[in-house]
Amino acid sequence: MTTRRIIACLDVKDGKVVKGVRFLDLKLKGDPAELASRYEEEGADEIVFLDISATVEGRKTLLEKVRETASVLSIPLTVGGGVRTVEDVSNLLSNGADKVSLNTVAAENPSVVSMASREFGAQAVVVAIDAKRVGNGWRVFVRSGTKDTGLDAVDWAKRVEEMGAGEILLTSIDRDGTRDGYDLELTKAVVRATKVPVIASGGAGKPDHFLSVFRQAGADAALAAGIFHDGVIRIRELKDYLKDAGIEVRT
């Protein structure tokens, strides 16, 4: 049986963790290193650190904050935001990231994905796909959800796998921060189209949502932010719930 992972996400702006709804209306939640440490203690399997304003502001990821966060963790840390080159990937890995998430750059300069995968291994390369429902399908949006690439999300997932992505971080923009549940249809479509692990993101609001995205959509991991920041769900209790429901989790 596949062991499912619970991942806590830190959306970082100006060095502080924030959270909004559908990528808008951001509210301050705390310090990245402090929250990361707390989530590891609570039983998170991994931490994702996303510098959400780096690309839009045309700057690189805040390496100092990455180092601080990595220094308090013994679980894997994925870092994204503001990555434009293979050198940026290298800098993040040498400053404490275990994996690097590529989002906008993957769509605008796909060769970075394949080059990073060759140089550092697929296990270090995560491609983040921010998808929004358009018509009967889903389209890929970049630059913090502000730019429609015209790419079909499921087709794009297949392509990034071929380019060397070792994992896909799939976020439903429609569900982000709503706490209405993950987009099961979107997640299932990407899981079926690819062989690499898929992390479901966007919409977690209660334990049942995690169960559904694992059992019905087949996600390998489920990511959440706001419900953990606000104490709506404790990770340890969530894992107990999933285990009781027959889902294999690390305890």
From Swiss-Prot:
It catalyses: 5-[(5-phospho-1-deoxy-D-ribulos-1-ylimino)methylamino]-1-(5-phospho-beta-D-ribosyl)imidazole-4-carboxamide + L-glutamine = D-erythro-1-(imidazol-4-yl)glycerol 3-phosphate + 5-amino-1-(5-phospho-beta-D-ribosyl)imidazole-4-carboxamide + L-glutamate + H(+). Pathway: Amino-acid biosynthesis; L-histidine biosynthesis; L-histidine from 5-phospho-alpha-D-ribose 1-diphosphate: step 5/9. It is found in: Cytoplasm. The keyword Amino-acid biosynthesis applies. The active site is at 11, 130. It comes from the Archaea. One of its GO terms (cellular component) is cytoplasm. GO terms for molecular function: imidazoleglycerol-phosphate synthase activity; lyase activity. Pfam families: His_biosynth (PF00977). Heterodimer of HisH and HisF. This is Imidazole glycerol phosphate synthase subunit HisF. It comes from Metallosphaera sedula (strain ATCC 51363 / DSM 5348 / JCM 9185 / NBRC 15509 / TH2).
